[in-house]
């Protein structure tokens, strides 16, 4: 796994052994950040259900001011910390251990990226409900194309859906 563009372009980052996480594919990550390009510089970013931290690290590489990595899996937390240390970017990042639904509202940001494990469909709705109460400028949800997400949740309205293979990105603002 590698960083696609920006300050840390082509730098390798560790992944988590086994099937406990499903990293965002490089092509989908590139598409995401091509869309975010005008908004990422100087933004604050939350990578919720962070896994390896690849999405939040990509945000930092492309100019985000600060990123929060929300994750509960201990092995994933260790990998995120190792990846941040290898890039010497710890001062611009905060790793938050614990269930995302308990930590999400304590870390407001300009851009929030949600990528819950695909089988946890209720987690998507619950996270969007939380964000809908105190909406960020932009929320992006990575999900399986077969999952139907709401058009609106609280103050958030879906503005765009991008599909690639079995993956989709739903944008809310």
Locations of regions flagged by a protein language model:
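Class I S-adenosyl-L-methionine-dependent methyltransferase catalytic core
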Residues: 1-173
């Amino acid at each position: 796994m590698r960083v696609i563009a920006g300050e840390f372009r082509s730098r390798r980052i560790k992944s988590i052994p086994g099937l406990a996480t499903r990293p965002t594919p490089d092509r989908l990550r590139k598409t995401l950040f091509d869309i975010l390009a005008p908004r990422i510089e100087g933004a604050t970013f939350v990578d919720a259900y962070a896994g390896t931290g690849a999405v939040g690290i990509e945000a930092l590489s492309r100019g985000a001011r600060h990123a929060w990595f929300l994750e509960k899996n201990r092995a994933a937390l260790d990998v995120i910390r190792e990846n941040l240390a290898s890039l010497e970017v710890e001062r611009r990042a905060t790793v938050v251990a614990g269930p995302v639904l308990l930590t999400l509202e304590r870390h407001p940001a300009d851009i929030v990226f949600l990528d819950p494990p695909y089988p946890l469909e209720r987690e998507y709705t619950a996270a969007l409900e939380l964000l809908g109460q105190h909406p960020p400028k932009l929320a992006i949800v990575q999900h399986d194309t077969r999952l139907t997400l709401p058009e609106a949740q609280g103050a958030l309205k879906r503005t765009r859906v991008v599909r690639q293979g079995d993956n989709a990105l739903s944008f809310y603002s």
